[in-house]
Amino acid sequence: MVDKSQETTHFGFQTVAKEQKADMVAHVFHSVASKYDVMNDLMSFGIHRLWKRFTIDCSGVRRGQTVLDLAGGTGDLTAKFSRLVGETGKVVLADINESMLKMGREKLRNIGVIGNVEYVQANAEALPFPDNTFDCITISFGLRNVTDKDKALRSMYRVLKPGGRLLVLEFSKPIIEPLSKAYDAYSFHVLPRIGSLVANDADSYRYLAESIRMHPDQDTLKTMMQDAGFESVDYYNLTAGVVALHRGYKF
């Protein structure tokens, strides 16, 4: 029998005990929650808004449907899904991190998004929802922080309705070599400095860069989704593969 206390995983470039990673990731997001939206705009030059818009366009979400915005953070996708599903639909904004969930709730209420949105603190590896609950699940820039990604994908598959779809928006591997080198230089030298100046937290943004490099590439993630049960899995490279959107269905 394997001693679970001896099982390891990665936290950025570090090797840590599996049972420690969730707490370490939680510390990162507790630290950056208050500056999360500002940093997203600065780090991506605002392009993250286009990536998320494309995700919405590919979701096929319609009025009356039920959507899970997993690792939904400050609620960018939830705000848009709320309008799409209307009064007869529902969006669940779920995040494992209490600080991020609080920021999302406050932000959405301040812009008048109420009524058809619920907030749930949840671990992607063990989603607290019945089987066949959601028409669509999105996880945006969250999967790379999950300790057991395969377990999380199986959990998402379980709570999707037949005919439902999962969309994973995540940093990936640039497909143009010169861009890859420039991206590395930006990630490891510029991002931590921005984090230090704006959020007073260089370490969290160093972890961000490292976690991106440790995340599975496009084809590996596609295979992982297929292994979890998803069918008709495909992906779109955005900004030359800096980010990829994967989509899979439960039939």
Swiss-Prot record:
Entries under Pfam families matching the protein: Ubie_methyltran
Keyword entries, A-Z: Menaquinone biosynthesis, Methyltransferase, S-adenosyl-L-methionine, Transferase, Ubiquinone biosynthesis
Reactions listed under catalytic activity: a 2-demethylmenaquinol + S-adenosyl-L-methionine = a menaquinol + S-adenosyl-L-homocysteine + H(+); a 2-methoxy-6-(all-trans-polyprenyl)benzene-1,4-diol + S-adenosyl-L-methionine = a 5-methoxy-2-methyl-3-(all-trans-polyprenyl)benzene-1,4-diol + S-adenosyl-L-homocysteine + H(+)
Gene Ontology biological process terms, A to Z: aerobic respiration; menaquinone biosynthetic process; methylation
GO molecular function terms attached to this record: 2-methoxy-6-polyprenyl-1,4-benzoquinol methyltransferase activity; demethylmenaquinone methyltransferase activity
CDD domains xrefs: AdoMet_MTases (cd02440)
Known EC number: 2.1.1.163, 2.1.1.201
Involved pathway(s): Quinol/quinone metabolism; menaquinone biosynthesis; menaquinol from 1,4-dihydroxy-2-naphthoate: step 2/2; Cofactor biosynthesis; ubiquinone biosynthesis
UniProt xrefs under InterPro entries: SAM-dependent_MTases_sf (IPR029063), UbiE/COQ5_MeTrFase (IPR004033), UbiE/COQ5_MeTrFase_CS (IPR023576)
Residues binding S-adenosyl-L-methionine, per UniProt: 74, 95, 123-124, 140
Function, as annotated: Methyltransferase required for the conversion of demethylmenaquinol (DMKH2) to menaquinol (MKH2) and the conversion of 2-polyprenyl-6-methoxy-1,4-benzoquinol (DDMQH2) to 2-polyprenyl-3-methyl-6-methoxy-1,4-benzoquinol (DMQH2).
Family stated for the protein in its record: Belongs to the class I-like SAM-binding methyltransferase superfamily. MenG/UbiE family.
Protein name as annotated: Ubiquinone/menaquinone biosynthesis C-methyltransferase UbiE
Lineage: Bacteria, Pseudomonadati, Pseudomonadota, Gammaproteobacteria, Enterobacterales
